[in-house]
Design a protein with these regions (language model features):
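Carbohydrate-recognition beta-sandwich/jelly-roll modules
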Residues: 1-80, 85
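Aromatic- and carboxylate-enriched substrate-binding clefts and catalytic-loop regions
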Residues: 75-218
Length: 218
């Protein structure tokens, strides 16, 4: 076999598998919420910290989701589409003044008007829509807290039991647990993981640890 023949055969190889993989992987919307907007802010400070987060949350809606779903046509069957921060709160709600509004796990009706019904039904309709668009399924950003003045104990367990059962009914298979009142509370994160394992073992619970940049000298 000549060199030209080998090169031709190699260039024709397709290394992307035909069937979706079993290992969990996702594409997260957060960077696109920040940098995929149609408007442009020349001042980079508009992309940082709380200000940047406010702009990013404003981009979380059904119109943009329908556009995001068209990405990665060759590989999205392997990927969950991870809805990041902003999907379960109304427009204009931010943690600097309304932290206790986050964590409802109820798809905001103004942001996603086409997906109606009970909280579980809304999530299922959205998850089905994501799958019909060629993705592996829907993933959800979840804060390390409950919405409202709910303390640890039976009330907290009842709160998350209800939401885990919503996701089970909806077929949502991935949570990314991020910032929140209990972001740095290992016991709280363990509680969520163990409760999910008990009630909905098919759910993958990822824990994102929130911290400032680390440069190796501190």
């Amino acid at each position: 076999m000549g060199v030209q023949s080998v090169e031709s055969e190699a260039s024709a190889m397709n290394l992307i598998p035909n069937a979706p993989g079993l290992s969990p992987n996702y594409w997260c919307t957060w960077s696109t919420q920040n940098f995929g907007r149609e408007d442009e802010h020349p001042d980079y400070h508009n992309y940082l910290g709380g200000v940047g987060s406010q702009f990013a949350r404003a981009e979380m809606n059904e119109k943009n989701l329908r556009r995001w779903l068209q990405q990665f046509p060759k590989i999205r069957g392997d990927l969950y589409l991870m809805l990041d921060d902003g999907w379960d709160v109304p427009y204009g709600v931010h943690p600097d003044k309304s932290r206790d509004r986050f964590g409802t796990l109820e798809l905001d009706e103004e942001r996603f008007p086409s997906f109606t019904g009970t909280p579980a039904q809304r999530l299922k309709k959205l998850n089905d829509f994501v799958k019909e668009s060629g993705w592996r399924g829907l993933g959800l950003w979840v804060p390390a807290q409950a919405a409202g003045p709910i303390e640890k104990g039976p009330a907290m367990e009842a709160y998350w039991t209800e939401r885990l059962l919503w996701c089970k009914e909806a077929g949502v298979e991935y949570w990314k647990v991020d910032w929140g009142t209990y972001a740095h509370d290992v016991e709280y994160r363990l509680f969520l993981t163990q409760l999910a394992s008990k009630l909905y073992p098919q759910l993958i619970v990822e824990h994102a640890y929130c911290m400032i940049a680390y440069n190796g000298s501190q």
